[in-house]
Amino acid sequence: LKADYGLEGGSTLRTVAVGHPNYTSGAVGYMFIFGAQGTTGQVLSNDGAINHGFTIDASGVAEVMVPSSQFLNTAGAVLDKAVLVYANKAVSASFLNREQYTTDMSYLLDTGALGTEYRVLTWPYSYSTVQFSLTAIEDGTVATVTPAGALLTGRPASIPFDVILNKGQSAMYTASSGIELTGTRFQDNKPLAVFARGQFAHAPVTPGY
């Protein structure tokens, strides 16, 4: 991978990912991009912290490291930390959030598969918080969020509120462990990406350690 500050002609936004806070700041994110040999593209963020070109070789995969400083770190704030994947051919991708004892991976939907209405499905018991986020792939995206449980930003359960985002912007919301966010609803005027997780989830509820 190399630093590269201009998109190649023909590159299309293929997918998007965000990192959610893990157990500590020692967590590291990894983006794995799969495609045909010779596929080229770039991985970018609006804030400029991530800007790398890639070429997929005979292995069929390219890898980009994403430091935890690029993860969404402030609940309720609009942030420019999303990782956008552009490529000149179709690709698939996964995002790994790696930390000892608490690693998870998300398969990333193609931008064409993203929708305008979602329900959150998440596990309510964790070491710290239960989290969900939304990321826009178009300017002027307005999402109406109806949380299933009370959020730590002060938003009460069942009362809708709007989030306004431009392309590459994200907002994350959190709840205390034990608060059920499953069923939280998103109704959006444009397609966006939604992610949900527990910060060091406890399964079963009372771990044996």
What are these language model-derived features?
Residues 1-209:
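Conserved functional hotspot residues at active sites or interaction interfaces
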